[in-house]
């Protein structure tokens, strides 16, 4: 328990005060780049959290759902692409809150997709995929919730998402470079227990894990989206940030609608 406490203190200080140093993304080896949701401890944690989350009671008056109420109000079947959706917990979350029929594509790493299909072979209306070629339906809304910042080739990936021609595009909890047009890269450190939906107090096997985090230019992001989409909501969370070379980069939220 003392070790876990010290790890939490270190990560807190690292995030809020010390910060991270810029790294050259070309010098990050392939093994580290592919580590996200690709090694056993993290995979098993995601599965464990997913089982807990399915049993969790969701508060229907939660403010974070208000943004979707108008989008879903006149639709019975809603097709969603959840980019980096972990174990697919948002599918269960949305189904409980909105009482709609969802068909859910959960885009994740190949290792996690294989494990999810093995552990939950009889899931209905949710399909775990590891690339966009597996999409079989036109998408109503694309969700990128704290996932875009872990994509290395962000411009190309964003272009691929835009090409899907979804009616809505929603990005949230994503660090953005509001200062210039550069893509920044750091080796982000987090606690293992912080990954996936929610946190587990006193997690017995907690440890520090590291993986690349890419901070995309907010101006480039808006320019790419503006060709096909109209911005209908934007906010910055001043309490959620990453420090890189003593500069804060805040989490952004965007909701776009197809023109």
Explain the meaning of each model-derived region.
Residues 165-180, 185:
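Conserved beta-strand signature within the Rossmann-like core of class I S-adenosyl-L-methionine
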Residues 85-125:
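Class I SAM-dependent methyltransferase SAM/SAH-binding core
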Residues 140-154:
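A short SAM/SAH-binding and catalytic strip from SAM-dependent methyltransferases
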Residues 82:
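Class I SAM-dependent methyltransferase core
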Residues 150-164, 171:
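A short, conserved alpha-helix within the catalytic core of class I
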Residues 1-79, 88, 183-259:
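N-terminal accessory regions of S-adenosyl-L-methionine
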Residues 127-138:
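Short acidic low-complexity segments
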Residues 78, 140, 167:
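Conserved acidic residues
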